[in-house]
Amino acid sequence: MEAFSSKDMAMQAQKKILSRMASKSVAQMFIDDNSSEVLDELYRVSKEHSGNRAEAQKVVKNMIKIAVKVGVLFRHEKFSAEELSIAQEFRKKLHHGAMTAISFQEVEFTFDKSVMINLLSDCRDLLLKLVEKHLTPKSLDRIRHVFNHYSNPELLTHLYDPQGNLWSNLSKICSGLNRMIEEGKL
């Protein structure tokens, strides 16, 4: 006989509903203005680099879905002590990645795409390890899609070109990341 849990059912419903509603208006309920601005700039970077509006929207939508689902899992205290340790490691790696991204933008001639690719890959792997027991294979593919998209060497080279057309977007992204770090959100 299966054990019934209304709490588990409510969490599943929340994850399902929120994943279907990952639009900009719903994102604003869960994501502050600063984060929203960073997401908007990441969308513009993806759209400009790929020339594909639909793909850029899909990447950002996947990012929002992932953030919401991980937030729901935290809210419902679904992570074990071991997983919470992985979450801490992920948070530290993400913070380190943000600091590195900012440093590469602020200090000329320091950009090293292999460093950024490795940081993004490490973040992806930690996040996958954190949620692998909680999310569907489709959600895990969304995580891979987002991190693989932004760790594309051509995109990173294009983004970090001071003479390139994405430099102003990078400046805004780094500005937003700086604010998140100052506010203790990243």
Curated annotation (Swiss-Prot):
Keyword terms, alphabetized: Immunity, Innate immunity
Biological process per Gene Ontology, one example term: innate immune response
Signal peptide region: none
GO cellular component, one term: cytoplasm
Family: Belongs to the TNFAIP8 family. TNFAIP8L2 subfamily.
Function as written in the Swiss-Prot or TrEMBL entry: Acts as a negative regulator of innate and adaptive immunity by maintaining immune homeostasis. Negative regulator of Toll-like receptor and T-cell receptor function. Prevents hyperresponsiveness of the immune system and maintains immune homeostasis. Inhibits jun/ap1 and NF-kappa-B activation. Promotes Fas-induced apoptosis.
Domain notes: The central region was initially thought to constitute a DED (death effector) domain. However, 3D-structure data reveal a previously uncharacterized fold that is different from the predicted fold of a DED (death effector) domain. It consists of a large, hydrophobic central cavity that is poised for cofactor binding.
Protein name: Tumor necrosis factor, alpha-induced protein 8-like protein 2 A
Phylogenetic placement of the source organism: Eukaryota, Metazoa, Chordata, Craniata, Vertebrata
Chain's gene name: tnfaip8l2a
